[in-house]
Curated annotation (Swiss-Prot):
One of its GO terms (molecular function) is DNA-binding transcription factor activity. The modification N6-(pyridoxal phosphate)lysine is found at K330. The gene is tauR. Keywords: Activator, Aminotransferase, DNA-binding, Pyridoxal phosphate, Transcription, Transcription regulation, Transferase. Transcriptional activator, which is essential for taurine-dependent expression of the tpa-tauR-xsc operon. Acts by binding to direct repeats in the promoter region. In vitro, taurine does not influence the binding of TauR to the tpa promoter. This is HTH-type transcriptional regulator TauR. The keyword Lipid biosynthesis does not apply. SMART domains: HTH_GNTR. GO terms for biological process: biosynthetic process. Coiled coil: none annotated.
Length: 484
């Protein structure tokens, strides 16, 4: 790749001759890894004109660097970074001015210590990846997605993509959500009550930012989705944990003086429990009596292959106190980063203004591609294929778990893509996960799902969204052997 001439500049007041400073600039670029073997250097004429120096200065500097094996001259083809140049990975790190900056003091405490997923970046190379939230590329409809993406880039659609829509969403995508997605959750809404988000995590963040601040109180499930705890923590509000049982959140245990309750009512994360109707009604009644709002993270309802998914909490919301957050990441692919938020129009207007301040709107090309994929029926066909695959994988995993004597702590009744598991009390599943990586097995330790003040270390999650049925039995057997 060609190195842009703009990559080079001479700092005012530099020490040494122009030729020396130019050599130093190139060697620092190579040693830092910015310039890589095979990259083509700017021509001597172009670099001299850019820096405002004589061409002979650049020519002599290049000649010295060729003699030192930093650069390689290839005649009329140009000058390139040499493969014999020192390896940037082995070179001593160059001193940076930022090292003198006290970032621990300058960064706000809320920006420090935010959780990061504890999984290797190369997870797909492991033979037994029982990790949640990753897609199996073998199931995805690449051909039709590509066709929809090309159509979205066509002349007929491009006029919208090329405009700055400021805070507006793709009307075709909003219409499909209103007419096809929300009715499946028992929700009736109008366009002013829907906002497109950059995935469920972004929806949770937007909602929390417009609702909470220092001195206010929010409650979430324990165990619960780690991303919720991180989002609530960024607001400065007091975050309280409410223990769940085998049926989910217990409304009677909610603390007083709340501003917000976050729940995964239809499919609790991570236990997979579904909140019964009587508890849903009790939660809504508590919201009315206590004057708080409910943030419903309604994930993975599409994967209901054992029985129909329970209606959303929002479908029972007569008082307008539920903010409903949904996502397409689990049913399409996590890298899509598109979802939606449904709430009363005044709330959506406030969130839309915040979103516009941060990122205007999600990419128009992605929105239109998804809208076409949905409206042409490809999405429903994909979901049907995934449900069939997940049903088979769940059956295989259930048998493997039983055959190996592992203990299921939560599996849900409608489907999903994971099991919540419990190891013997003395087992630390973070240590277990490290040992299993050497065996080619990836699991999710359960500690991160719990309130840090009441953490449990002997739980873990096993997902089957990214592992084929043929690999499941051996992967489960390796987990069982590691637990013995």
């Amino acid at each position: 790749m060609a190195i842009p001439v703009e990559s080079f500049f001479l700092a005012p007041g530099g020490q040494g001759s122009l030729q020396h400073r130019l050599r130093q600039m190139v060697t620092e670029g190579i040693l830092s890894g910015r310039f890589r073997p095979g990259d083509r250097m700017p021509s001597t004429r172009a670099l001299a004109a850019h820096l405002g120096v004589a061409r002979i200065t650049v020519t002599l500097a290049y000649a010295d660097l060729v003699a030192s094996d930093y650069l390689l001259a290839r005649g009329r083809s140009g000058t390139f970074v040499s493969a014999a140049a020192p390896d940037a990975r082995k070179a001593r790190p160059l001193p940076r001015d930022g090292a003198r900056t006290d970032w621990a003091r300058l960064l706000h405490p809320r920006a420090q210590g935010l959780p990061r997923p504890d999984r290797p970046r190369d997870w797909s190379l492991y033979r037994y990846p029982f990790i949640y939230g990753q897609a199996d590329p073998e199931l995805f409809d690449h051909q039709n997605w590509r066709a929809c993406a090309l159509q979205a880039l066509g002349r007929r659609e491009f006029h919208r993509l090329s405009a700055d829509c400021y805070d507006e969403d793709d009307p075709l995508l909003v219409e499909y959500i209103l007419r096809h997605i929300l009715p499946r959750r028992g929700i009736a809404a109008v366009p002013s009550e829907v906002l497109i988000t950059m995935g469920a995590q972004n929806g949770l963040w937007l909602a929390a930012q417009v609702l909470l601040g220092p001195g206010e109180r929010a409650a979430m499930e324990n165990p619960g989705y780690p991303g919720t705890r991180a989002v609530l923590g960024t607001t400065g509000a007091e975050v309280l944990s409410v223990d769940v049982d085998d049926r989910g959140l217990v409304p009677a245990q909610l603390p007083a003086r709340l501003k917000l309750v976050v729940t995964t009512a239809s499919h609790h994360c991570p236990t997979n429990a579904t909140l019964p109707v009587e508890r849903r009604l009790a939660l809504l009644a508590a919201a009315e009596a206590g004057d708080f709002l409910i943030l419903e993270d309604d994930y993975e309802f599409e994967m209901s292959f054992l029985q129909s998914a329970a209606p959303s909490l929002k479908s029972l919301d007569a008082g307008g106190r539920v903010v409903h957050v949904g996502s397409f990441s689990k049913s399409l692919f996590p890298g899509l980063r598109l979802g939606y938020l449904v709430a009363p129009a005044p709330f959506v207007a406030a969130v839309r203004a915040l979103r516009a301040t941060v990122l205007r709107h999600p990419p128009g090309q992605l929105q239109r591609t998804l809208a076409l994929f949905l409206s042409l029926g490809h999405y429903d066909a994909l979901v049907a294929r995934m449900k069939a695959a997940y049903r088979l994988r769940r059956e295989v995993m259930t048998k493997a778990i039983e055959d190996n004597g592992l203990q299921i702590a939560g599996q849900g009744g409608f489907g999903g893509s994971s099991f919540w598991m419990q190891a013997p009390g003395a087992v630390d599943t973070e240590d277990l996960a490290l040992r299993l990586r050497a065996e080619g097995v990836l699991i999710e330790p359960g500690r991160v799902f719990f309130d840090p003040a009441r953490e449990r270390r002997n739980f873990y999650r096993l997902a089957y969204s990214s592992i084929g049925p043929a690999a499941i039995p051996e992967g489960i057997a390796r987990i069982a052997r590691a637990l013995r």
